[in-house]
């Protein structure tokens, strides 16, 4: 009888948890704040209960006494990942970081290394409360009644991505990450910026690859704006349609939301006609976004790292950037000319130093990498961060309505004077792969 009661209790608690959209977790020991779920160093993720750490090795519970919520915490000497089974949507996440008897240093990312909090340092005895806003997605396309009407055709490699696994995963990283609580609440009012594009935009899961899309959330005020990155490596405008990625967005986007569109690298290689294919689809997307009350923003594709004998960037994208500029004028929509800004940025870096922004690494720098990595299209985390700042700069300089949502994390930026790479902060995640993303 006792076993049956225990089973029934576990089943009911699991069922109720699965229906929840608000969650309160007290990290540390079994000494727990009222109304919070205790999370200790042994709380390994369990599908039955719907939450826990991806890996508990190296985790340490510390209890300093005092306040039940902030007097204890979880820490580790390596990155650790906390996952929660949660319905797709926009969420605010409130996190308490610090140590009532010591100092801490924490960087927070979500899903596929999407940057949220960078190098948050607390002094001895200091506890800080930080908020981030996150978009959680799945591959199912639903109508307004929530009924399934389709599905995104994911590529095989996408099945391993953290942003398609029906979980919200939070990465805690840095020298001394110390987490005492995590509260997750729905955010139904935030503007959503939907991003479409290819491997130069995607939330890349594996070090050393990165894109501006996954750095973008760091520069926005939480609660007001949420970034929803639907880009994927190797995609063209046509492929984005064929795999129903854009259909997913059309069924989710709301009036006042934004649709960022950056394609060109793969459209060029696919032999798509600028006139009958590329421009036609751009116009159709712009028209559909406007029809739904959303705000389209065109982003020209950044340059590849190809220099001429005078150390000037060579245009390898044919007429695709110009075609997008023309469409922006014809359709009277916002344009972020990342193509022009990247030319300035890369020329300021120069042929040799610009390698530090791309995936250029000696053999054996990463697992299963017997040969050198030398990629003139795809960026590392530093390059992706610099390009994200270019996009934000354009928003600010053009006085786009989104300007009022830019956070204090963005100070100012001049592509003629790139940030010093030695001052760029990025503790690497545990996910690493030398395989080049789709597309070029």
Could you tell me what each predicted segment is?
Residues 1-20:
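Bacterial Sec-dependent N-terminal signal peptides
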Residues 19-206, 369:
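Compositionally biased, intrinsically disordered or flexible polar/acidic segments
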Residues 45-53, 209-222:
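Short catalytic helix/loop segments, enriched in acidic residues and glycine
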Residues 111, 244-408, 416, 420-421, ...:
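Alpha-helical cap/lid subdomain in secreted, periplasmic
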Residues 223-237:
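A short beta-strand-loop structural module common to alpha/beta enzyme folds
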Residues 236-245:
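Structural motif
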